[in-house]
């Protein structure tokens, strides 16, 4: 099991949809989140991409030297950048990070944003471009001098003279819910990602990708992207979920859902269908809450509950074949600690041994001394 955290390069705070309780996302703040994740023993962090975010490659480059073990899941955007240039960027960051780069392949589901970035392709064309892009990208990073002429992309003698540390190349992660996405995942990527739909729906998606990959003689690993709201008791967790959205007006929800409706992303459509823009009945499966998706694009569901309940839901997804869990919570700095302290002890190794104390060569005692004389009692 690989447990990731998330860098909130598009904003952070205590509530959704309001400036109340918001905090500036400065480099120093992102450094705190990344170093907390590194110290606590998270496997890596996802850095989001898009016009609502700071640039993921610049952020990763700034944070790599400030962390020791943490891996960075950074987006590439086929159709926006040359596959050869993208491959060289990946090789350099992998080399400079000591092999800590992971690649998130993003086709882009917002036509308005895509046009702003210079891409006027429709849904099927974007997947055609992504397929051609990855054929070039993968071969370049394996040391080939690539000649390729496809429907959308053409290169001659494309090469990267400085190879990546990871072989054959930094692992490719990718998410999508359409047939075209499942075909691409089965053919070209290492880890297929899904957003946090109910387990039965996730099982169907994984089975479909698994079957398509088998027909191509490949195996694909799986991951899931979820928010999490964990507290000592279930009652506290559900109260925190309600508090997270208490400042969102109905007008803000309507505006957000109108914006999402222009997307041609099947995954975004499935996220929106879980709540239909309504505040009532947001628990769509045991301990799975769709409230985040009222105003947030992309991952819109959260695991909500006490540590045992959250760990049970994680195990439920793991039993389906999920190996990588990418979590986030508001605010991301405090919640990185809370999740590690409350849930890590209930997860498989190495997380159980970390127990929220993180990776350290200190043997204890941990906690404040009592009366300036006695060590704290072990629990």
UniProtKB/Swiss-Prot annotation:
GO-annotated molecular function: alkanesulfonate monooxygenase activity
EC code(s) of this entry: 1.14.14.5
Biological function: Catalyzes the desulfonation of aliphatic sulfonates.
Family annotation (PANTHER family): ALKANESULFONATE MONOOXYGENASE, ALKANESULFONATE MONOOXYGENASE-RELATED
SUPFAM superfamilies reported for this sequence: Bacterial luciferase-like
One GO-annotated biological process of the protein: alkanesulfonate catabolic process
Keywords: Flavoprotein, FMN, Monooxygenase, Oxidoreductase
Protein name from the UniProt record: Alkanesulfonate monooxygenase
Family to which this protein belongs: Belongs to the SsuD family.
Catalytic reaction(s) noted: an alkanesulfonate + FMNH2 + O2 = an aldehyde + FMN + sulfite + H2O + 2 H(+)
């Amino acid at each position: 099991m690989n447990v990731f955290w998330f860098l909130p390069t598009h904003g952070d705070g205590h509530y959704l949809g309001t400036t109340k309780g918001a905090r500036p996302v400065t480099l120093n703040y992102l450094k705190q989140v990344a170093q907390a994740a590194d110290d606590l023993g998270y496997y890596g962090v996802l850095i989001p991409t898009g016009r609502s975010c700071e640039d993921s490659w610049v952020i990763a480059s700034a944070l790599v030297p400030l962390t020791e073990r943490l891996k960075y899941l950074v987006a590439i955007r086929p159709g926006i950048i040359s596959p050869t240039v993208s491959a060289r960027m990946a090789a350099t960051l992998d080399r400079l990070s000591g092999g800590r780069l992971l690649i998130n392949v993003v086709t882009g589901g917002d036509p308005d944003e895509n046009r702003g970035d210079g891409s006027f392709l429709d849904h099927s064309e974007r997947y055609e471009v992504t397929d051609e892009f990855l054929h070039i990208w993968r071969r370049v990073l394996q040391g080939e001098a690539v000649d390729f002429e496809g429907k959308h992309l053409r290169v001659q003698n494309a090469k990267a003279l400085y190879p990546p540390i990871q072989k054959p190349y930094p692992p490719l992660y990718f998410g999508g819910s359409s047939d075209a996405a499942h075909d691409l995942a089965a053919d070209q990527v290492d880890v297929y990602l899904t957003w946090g739909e109910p387990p039965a729906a996730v099982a169907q998606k994984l089975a479909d990708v698994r079957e398509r990959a088998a027909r191509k003689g490949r195996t694909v690993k799986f991951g899931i992207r979820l928010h999490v709201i964990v507290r000592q008791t279930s009652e506290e967790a559900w109260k925190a979920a309600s508090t997270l959205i208490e400042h969102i007006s109905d007008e803000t929800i309507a505006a957000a859902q109108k914006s999402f409706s222009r997307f041609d992303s099947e995954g975004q459509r499935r996220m929106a269908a879980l709540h239909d823009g309504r505040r009532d009945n947001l628990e769509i499966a045991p301990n799975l809450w769709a409230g985040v998706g009222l105003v947030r694009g992309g991952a819109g569901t959260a695991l909500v509950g006490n540590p045992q309940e959250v760990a049970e839901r994680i195990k439920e997804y793991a039993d389906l074949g999920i190996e990588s869990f990418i979590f986030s919570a508001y605010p991301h700095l405090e919640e990185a600690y809370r999740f590690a302290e409350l849930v890590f002890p209930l997860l498989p190794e190495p997380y159980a041994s970390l127990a929220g104390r993180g990776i350290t060569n200190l043997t204890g005692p941990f906690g404040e001394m009592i009366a300036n004389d006695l060590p704290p009692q072990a629990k």
